[in-house]
């Protein structure tokens, strides 16, 4: 079985369990230090979206980050390779502003220049990096914006942790190998001409220990101070990227 089908089956199973239990995850459930990059991701989206925008979310999962998009009043097309995950989204959000569509991000079933904005929250590793970049650029309108939050694969501590998840059967090998790195961000810069990035969480691996010792608020401040004191890039856990199509 291909890695793509392994991941599809995994997420279909998780989505079915969520539907059966009526228990849906949200980015808002993250601890404060880990939620910081998602807050920034949402703030960048808020700067470029309005109720007339047509937004494509790739790798939407069970809608962990879709609620914020819908709250802006924009029309949202949530896509994922897992049909059961999209079923969760449809159950969670009953609005005519939402469209769901089963789609492979390597070959999006949309015409060129269809969307004002494309967003991705943690999904860029679920397709061939070059093919996904090509498809994102293709479906964006001129002056359209791509905004993403994802993990960065340059820190050896985080790379080791992802490999442990693979050994435990929680991730496929191709997914961890395609986790974005600085070289991939350079490809986005070459394609779009210019990108804006911000990096977070050089000490996120210490978060559980810090929270036990200091609590969430102080731990968040410590993490922020470390990120600001040092020019974190290679050591980052997460990044937020914004690129505009010329």
Each PLM stretch: what is its role?
Residues 176-193, 197:
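Short alpha-helix
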Residues 119:
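A conserved beta-strand element that flanks and buttresses the S-adenosyl-L-methionine
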Residues 62-107:
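Class I SAM-dependent methyltransferase SAM/SAH-binding core
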Residues 131-142:
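A short glycine-rich, Lys/Arg-flanked "PGG" loop and its adjoining helix->strand segment in the class I
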Residues 1-50, 147-170:
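Conserved class I S-adenosyl-L-methionine
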Residues 127, 167-183:
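Acceptor-substrate binding/catalytic loop of class I
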Residues 165, 198-246:
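A C-terminal cap/extension of S-adenosyl-L-methionine-dependent methyltransferases
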């Amino acid at each position: 079985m291909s890695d793509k089908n392994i991941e599809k089956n995994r997420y279909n199973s998780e989505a079915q369990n969520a539907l059966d239990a009526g228990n849906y995850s949200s980015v808002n459930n993250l601890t404060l230090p880990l939620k910081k990059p998602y807050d920034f991701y949402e703030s960048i989206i808020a700067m470029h979206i309005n109720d007339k925008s047509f937004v494509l979310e790739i790798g939407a999962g069970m809608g962990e980050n879709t609620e914020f998009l819908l709250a802006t009043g924009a029309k949202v097309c949530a896509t994922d390779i897992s049909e059961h995950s999209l079923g969760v989204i449809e159950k969670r959000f009953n609005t005519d502003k939402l469209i769901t569509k089963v789609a492979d991000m390597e070959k999006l079933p949309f015409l060129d220049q269809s969307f004002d904005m494309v967003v991705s929250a943690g999904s860029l590793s679920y397709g061939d990096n070059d093919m996904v970049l090509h498809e994102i650029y293709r479906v964006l309108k001129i002056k359209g914006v791509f905004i993403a939050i994802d993990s960065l694969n340059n820190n050896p501590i985080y790379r080791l942790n992802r490999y442990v998840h693979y050994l435990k059967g929680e991730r496929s090998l191709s997914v961890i190998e395609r986790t974005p790195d600085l070289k991939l961000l350079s490809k986005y810069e070459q394609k779009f001409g210019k990108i804006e990035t911000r990096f977070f969480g050089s000490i996120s691996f210490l978060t559980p220990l810090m929270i036990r010792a200091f609590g969430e608020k102080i731990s968040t401040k410590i993490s922020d101070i470390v990120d600001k004191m040092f020019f974190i890039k290679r050591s980052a856990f997460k990044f937020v990227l914004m690129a505009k199509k010329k």
